[in-house]
Amino acid sequence: MMFFKRTILACTVALLFPALPSYAEVGAENGNSAQAEKPGLWKRFTSNVAETWNNSPNKDLYVPAITWHNRLTYSQEKIDSYNERPWGGGYGISRYDSDGDWHGLYMMVFKDSFNKWEPIGGYAYEKIWRPLEDKDFRLGLGFTASITARDNWNYIPIPAPLPLASIGYKQLTFQATYIPGTYNNGNVFFGWFRWQF
């Protein structure tokens, strides 16, 4: 029962945190026009989260695909004991901005390395490149500002800012991150498919 309560708490926090900037005053008047032209990083971040929350035309289905523990940083005994098939699922909303870059809010639940449920949710951004003539093919590089909770940490919600990379064609995208760490801890490649509808 405690697992369920903490999981619900973690999911609620993960969904509410990115929504908070949508309640902030987005277009406050400021006498300094130079500052209005170039908002700071935090202002830009909260504005993008609010815009994504309020004006995202796309719905996304997330399907976890792989967790891979870096063989150079784990003992064989640990590798043999870990789950590397993170079945689960998730849902999100997303949009492309005027520069063609991708913004998303998401919630996903998957089986972690110990085969226990792990929720994660938050905001994600990717700078998008379309290197081919076929503009449906794209590459992305960015970050996710998320919150997760794990069984081995008693499902206490913790922030998880992580790098993000992707390769996509039309509605299907493979996204991935790398969780840094120390020997026998962290250093995990985590990838999932995202289907936009």
Curated annotation (Swiss-Prot):
<keyword id="KW-0012">Acyltransferase</keyword>
<comment type="similarity">
    <text>Belongs to the lipid A palmitoyltransferase family.</text>
</comment>
<comment type="subunit">
    <text>Homodimer.</text>
</comment>
<feature type="site" description="Role in lipopolysaccharide recognition">
    <location>
        <position position="78"/>
    </location>
</feature>
<feature type="active site">
    <location>
        <position position="112"/>
    </location>
</feature>
<keyword id="KW-0998">Cell outer membrane</keyword>
<feature type="site" description="Role in the phospholipid gating">
    <location>
        <position position="183"/>
    </location>
</feature>
<protein>
    <recommendedName>
        <fullName>Lipid A acyltransferase PagP</fullName>
        <ecNumber>2.3.1.251</ecNumber>
    </recommendedName>
</protein>
<keyword id="KW-0732">Signal</keyword>
<dbReference type="Pfam" id="PF07017">
    <property type="entry name" value="PagP"/>
</dbReference>
<keyword id="KW-0808">Transferase</keyword>
<dbReference type="InterPro" id="IPR011250">
    <property type="entry name" value="OMP/PagP_b-brl"/>
</dbReference>
<feature type="active site">
    <location>
        <position position="113"/>
    </location>
</feature>
<dbReference type="GO" id="GO:0009245">
    <property type="term" value="P:lipid A biosynthetic process"/>
</dbReference>
<dbReference type="GO" id="GO:0016746">
    <property type="term" value="F:acyltransferase activity"/>
</dbReference>
<keyword id="KW-0472">Membrane</keyword>
<feature type="active site">
    <location>
        <position position="69"/>
    </location>
</feature>
<dbReference type="InterPro" id="IPR009746">
    <property type="entry name" value="LipidA_acyl_PagP"/>
</dbReference>
<dbReference type="GO" id="GO:0009279">
    <property type="term" value="C:cell outer membrane"/>
</dbReference>
<feature type="signal peptide">
    <location>
        <begin position="1"/>
        <end position="24"/>
    </location>
</feature>
<comment type="function">
    <text>Transfers a fatty acid residue from the sn-1 position of a phospholipid to the N-linked hydroxyfatty acid chain on the proximal unit of lipid A or its precursors.</text>
</comment>
